[in-house]
Each structure stands twice: as structure tokens, then as C-alpha cells.
A protein has these predicted regions:
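N-terminal "domain-start" segment that seeds a small globular fold
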Residues: 2-36, 57-58
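Short active-site neighborhood of thiol/selenol oxidoreductases, capturing the structured segment around
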Residues: 38-61, 77
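Structural microenvironment flanking redox-active thiols in thiol-disulfide oxidoreductases
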Residues: 55-105
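Thiol-/selenol-based redox modules, centered on thioredoxin-like
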Residues: 123, 131-167
Length: 167
């Protein structure tokens, strides 16, 4: 059932869901250091978290739907490739490969790669596995998770996002 994909972070205690998105540091593909979500305070943030290279298609579909419905005007939208911490050489190599594949400055700017303990990050957000993308709507100043979901965002999700951020 689609309804089960959503967890409102303000749900009653006992659901086990985190309320605050953890601060993570990374660099966008334009080589600018960013701290997510702390550096995004002008608008609510939609963060799309991907764990596998093949998730890119789902990330692209999600962002396309958000932009087609003018969510880019109301929200900061970023994608966060989460990669297990590796050697500096491997990080440089992966970043270079991603930059070579993505030429669009706007897409490079919103893609913030983080190298960290992937399991620790997933545990902090109560993500059971890395089989699909996860998305989070994060309050612009409190870093609280207003809404979250798994998989490609749907038109029904857009309604939920609008409702969750109307207050």
C-alpha cells in the first residue's frame, strides 16, 4: 500500500523515526564544500539520498517531477550520493568520474557527494537497506524532518509534501 511508504517525522514517539536530519559534510560536483542540511536555510530542503550508481535514474525521475511541478521555486532540491568512506585517492577518482558524466553546472551544484560510514548514516535515519533512494523534506531552520519517503516521488507524494510544509 502506498500509504505505508510515508512516515511523518512528527509521528508519535515509538515509531523509531529520527526527527532531525544529521549534519553531513561533502562537496558538490563544482568542488564547493557543503554541510547538509545546515547550509540550506533560505527554503525548506528536499534531499534525495542515493546509495547505488543505478539509483541515478530514480533520482533523475524524482527531480524531473519536482521541477515540472515548480517545487524548485519553493524548495531547495539536492541529491546526495552516499558513499562508504574510502581512501582520498578513491574519492578524487569517483568525484572526477561524476564530474565528467555531469556537465550541467546546475546539476553539479545540487549534487553533494558525502563519504562517510554508510551504515552509521543509514542507522541514524532508520534506513534498513540501500536498495532504493530515500527522500526527506527538511525544515529550513530547524533541520527537522517534516516528511520522508522511499522510492521515486509520485504525484501523491507532491500533495503530501505541500500539505506537510503549508504550516
Amino acid at each position: 500500500m502506498v500509504e505505508e511508504r510515508f512516515v511523518n517525522a512528527a509521528a508519535p514517539a515509538g515509531k523509531g523515526m529520527p526527527v532531525v536530519f544529521p549534519s553531513v559534510q561533502g562537496k558538490n560536483l563544482n568542488k564547493v564544500s557543503k554541510t547538509v542540511p545546515d547550509d540550506f536555510t533560505t527554503q525548506h530542503l528536499i534531499a534525495i539520498v542515493a546509495f547505488q550508481q543505478w539509483h541515478q535514474r530514480n533520482v533523475d525521475q524524482t527531480i524531473e517531477l519536482l521541477e515540472k511541478n515548480a517545487f524548485g521555486e519553493q524548495f531547495e532540491i539536492i541529491e546526495i550520493p552516499v558513499i562508504q568512506k574510502a581512501t582520498r585517492f578513491r574519492q578524487i577518482r569517483l568525484d572526477a568520474l561524476m564530474r565528467a558524466a555531469i556537465r550541467d553546472h546546475r546539476i553539479r551544484n545540487r549534487t553533494i557527494t558525502v563519504y562517510l560510514d554508510k551504515n552509521e548514516f543509514m542507522t541514524s535515519l532508520d534506513i534498513e537497506d540501500d536498495a532504493s533512494i530515500h527522500w526527506f523534506v527538511i525544515h529550513r531552520s530547524a533541520n527537522t524532518i517534516l516528511l520522508r519517503g522511499e522510492g521515486v516521488i509520485t504525484p501523491k507524494d507532491l500533495e503530501r509534501i505541500t500539505t506537510a510544509t503549508d504550516s
